[in-house]
Amino acid sequence: MKKKLVLIDGSSVAYRAFFALPLLHNDKGIHTNAVYGFTMMLNKILAEEEPTHMLVAFDAGKTTFRHEAFQEYKGGRQQTPPELSEQFPLLRELLRAYRIPAYELENYEADDIIGTLAARAEQEGFEVKVISGDRDLTQLASPHVTVDITKKGITDIEPYTPEAVREKYGLTPEQIVDLKGLMGDKSDNIPGVPGIGEKTAVKLLRQFGTVENVLASIDEIKGEKLKETLRQHREMALLSKKLAAIRRDAPVELSLDDIAYQGEDREKVVALFKELGFQSFLEKMESPSSEEEKPLAKMAFTLADRVTEEMLADKAALVVEVVEENYHDAPIVGIAVVNEHGRFFLRPETALADPQFVAWLGDETKKKSMFDSKRAAVALKWKGIELCGVSFDLLLAAYLLDPAQGVDDVAAAAKMKQYEAVRPDEAVYGKGAKRAVPDEPVLAEHLVRKAAAIWALERPFLDELRRNEQDRLLVELEQPLSSILAEMEFAGVKVDTKRLEQMGEELAEQLRTVEQRIYELAGQEFNINSPKQLGVILFEKLQLPVLKKSKTGYSTSADVLEKLAPYHEIVENILQHYRQLGKLQSTYIEGLLKVVRPDTKKVHTIFNQALTQTGRLSSTEPNLQNIPIRLEEGRKIRQAFVPSESDWLIFAADYSQIELRVLAHIAEDDNLMEAFRRDLDIHTKTAMDIFQVSEDEVTPNMRRQAKAVNFGIVYGISDYGLAQNLNISRKEAAEFIERYFESFPGVKRYMENIVQEAKQKGYVTTLLHRRRYLPDITSRNFNVRSFAERMAMNTPIQGSAADIIKKAMIDLNARLKEERLQARLLLQVHDELILEAPKEEMERLCRLVPEVMEQAVTLRVPLKVDYHYGSTWYDAK
């Protein structure tokens, strides 16, 4: 389980709670509104975030190191109302009852405690959530640190990831301190530079990166008055930045182990709530929660020592239990069957040795209802046993009803229908390193309860799917696909380990060469993988411009290095060669070699069929969908994927621009449909429109930019996002998008209509009626709402493309069997299908595969498939 640290800015949240709620007091006349609001927030965080570690930070006193640097810091702030001051001791008592550590540090602010612990936790691999009412903390946002800013109400929050910070301010989180340095902050009495507001500050920082760079480049700035102001207030700008910067190295004398969350002291919490008069919280605590472990009513079943006729009914719910996450060749620990005759538990050694039971498992006419049937099917295949006749899969049904639920066991699916007679797998097996199979009586009851739940839930799930017009999606698409994926997983993909090892040696040699070149350019040897040492070389020795600082010194992140590439050859070597080659070596070469099975010489991936919200498949252990294609060295890794038989070849077929073709169909845009019907190069056509040039005048760069516009539109991209992608101004990006919509007005109409439809219905659908619910589409938070709107635009397109390729897999599998070909599906990678087949079947596949794929569905525009074959996956291009 991923460790998660929640850090709360206690003073800020208490202040917000106090002013968000009317003055409340208990029967002793003590004011309690801030404590009440704080409790609301705590309960919400504990329920939603499930933190493993937690701390509330408070300001220690009125003076800090910032006051020493600038006496007027926070001057002019109103005194804390006495009605709030008297509640701080109660807040401390509340935290003691909840067993959440509270911490303050002399000479520092709560922000510095939070910044320091967030930095430590991130380095230790934690996910971190910061809660505050102070936007200054958005500077802490990073890939693993999210900052939730409370808004008007105490539980109404605005989440800030690095992307959200960029969306709101047009700056990175690291630049927030530079923003304060230039424009100041009235709430903290940080002066900044007189006359510079947010707009000017953002403009300067987007041009120069930091306050220091702005001050070093005054001569390049337009406007004499602005130049003079910056010269006069240079020191104040630097001081203001220093005042705004949150410390990441405060002397916090706590370890992360010290703030592990152990759960509340229930007795103390109840006693405190009674004292404070928090009746509503008391009622929630005293009423049994559906989340709590409740004793289940007894369920009668037979613990059978042999297979009997009544177990082998025409219809049954079946559980074939595999506890290990990777179910390839994993032990089956138990089997449960529930049907009209009763409930039965069978030991696997009994059931799987019985010819009648094995025949029943493989009988297509004996209908079986299961949860995640693919898992059981693959585990059985490794034992030479076939599973057929799966007529209902609860996992897939739950996934279709709401893909955002993240259903991962029978209990989670049961919860969707308020069925409570089954426990979560984690409650029985434990989790992580403590996961283990319990004694047989406990195991038997758990498996029987799971089978009984599947038996009881099939009808209500199917009824709702029918109401949603999704029953055919389950029965005709997802369930048949599950069987095909099981075959693909079990078959695996053969890997030429010698070739992979050879590539590893070649990469290692390239890395050594690049390493030596970097040392030559640096004039000394150093640890290239150390951001600290690399920062010293780049910014102190080679004097490259400092674009941003990290919590530990100079930032040497990929985005920084990309901007520095024109300044020195060493940067290109570090970024494009050393880092990329290093990742290929560690992630792909070494990573793949670790998962090749010695007995089959293959990798056996796991396709996740019920994970993404768009319906796309993903794969894990290993992830074969992210084998790199941009870098030639990365593409070469595909040379190691070879056919299973010596006289076979790899055949690859992929849909050409399927998402844009789906967009043309859904939007019914005449110009876009006409372009595809005439088989025009759609990116060239778009370039002609947005640059207003003839076909002959379209340059490769214009086509590249047009391609970014085409695919950006599919994802509901904003002018800001497009500007970032193409490294152009927002104005240019806005003009590109405007011209695109002028050329394809049907697309604009579709984008507007689909967002309105999502707001009315709460969801969007694909061509085959797959739904994606978008509860945030009406959010008052602009960033949250905008993201939901982009999902509304994209999901019908991406989801329909996913549906089409799934349908193509089913149709193709059927045709291969119908024509008695030996060819078989190996992989599905985004819009591409990979097969292997004997050489003599290639000619037939060149006709059959594109024919089947192009006829999977009928659109208003033709589907187009490109195909190639060769002795390796790399050669099939």
Curated annotation (Swiss-Prot):
SMART domains membership: 35EXOc (SM00474), 53EXOc (SM00475), HhH2 (SM00279), POLAc (SM00482)
Name the catalysed reactions: DNA(n) + a 2'-deoxyribonucleoside 5'-triphosphate = DNA(n+1) + diphosphate
Q: Which domain of life is it from?
A: Bacteria
Q: Which CDD domains match?
A: DNA_pol_A_pol_I_C (cd08637), DNA_polA_exo (cd06128), H3TH_53EXO (cd09898), PIN_53EXO (cd09859)
- Residues annotated as region Polymerase? 469-877
Record-level Gene Ontology MF annotations: 3'-5' exonuclease activity; 5'-3' exonuclease activity; DNA binding; DNA-directed DNA polymerase activity
Q: Where is the 3'-5' exonuclease domain?
A: 311-465
Q: Which GO terms describe its biological process?
A: DNA-templated DNA replication; double-strand break repair
Q: Which UniProt keywords apply?
A: DNA damage, DNA repair, DNA replication, DNA-binding, DNA-directed DNA polymerase, Exonuclease, Hydrolase, Nuclease, Nucleotidyltransferase, Transferase
Protein function = In addition to polymerase activity, this DNA polymerase exhibits 3'-5' and 5'-3' exonuclease activity.
Description of how the protein assembles with itself and partners: Single-chain monomer with multiple functions.
Name used for this protein in its record: DNA polymerase I
- Say which species the protein is native to: Bacillus caldotenax
Which gene is the coding source of this polypeptide chain?
polA
